[in-house]
Amino acid sequence: MHQINRKIQNKIDNIKYLQNELMNFKNFSEDEISNLLQKFEKTPRDEVSFYFKALFTNLEFANVLLEIADKYKENKKIQINILSSIGNMIRRYGLEETDEIYDYFKTNMFIKNVGVYVAIHLPYLKRFEKENFWEYFMKIKDMTPKKMAETTFLNIVNEHITEIPNEHKGEVIAFLKQKQQNSNNEGGQKYYQELIYTILRGE
């Protein structure tokens, strides 16, 4: 039988411990739950390993996270950590994307200081409404925190640069020109200029 190395085993034990504590969240205060979630959120973002797959695709646990999110709707720190946890569990480990999970992401799309964490993962969910694709994308750059919102929007522009609808190209180019002007190094300025050229060439 293959021996799991100690480093991996320690991570497995930590994930199991945090999941077990969160499964029994009713025994803890709001602050204690928030602290547990802050620790757990780091685990699906950590280096991917086959050994973690069964833990991160546990739908029963994901549903408990949704239950916690519903109970503490006004706690943005809790919402952010749950959105990040579930998003990474889906994208990195293949957690089943249920209607309840998708609806939870949609509910938080435009919540101040929370919506940007939705934007990191929502475009990659299977149920993402393609007809509102670019209408939603164009709103991401104006979310808060500003730096994270602009980085997320820039990543999306990069991934879909040949698909930008004509009606949005002017606004995207204006955003890129502003980023270019604010860039304090030649490499950054060249990067934004190349993106602009790519968009213009597609017209």
Task: Explain the meaning of each model-derived region.
Residues H2, I12-K16, R45-S49, N63, ...:
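Extended alpha-solenoid scaffolds built from HEAT/ARM-like alpha-helical repeats
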Residues A119-I120, L125-E203:
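Extended alpha-helical scaffolding segments
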Residues M1-M23, Q181-E186, L200-E203:
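Short, Lys/Arg-enriched, disordered terminal segments
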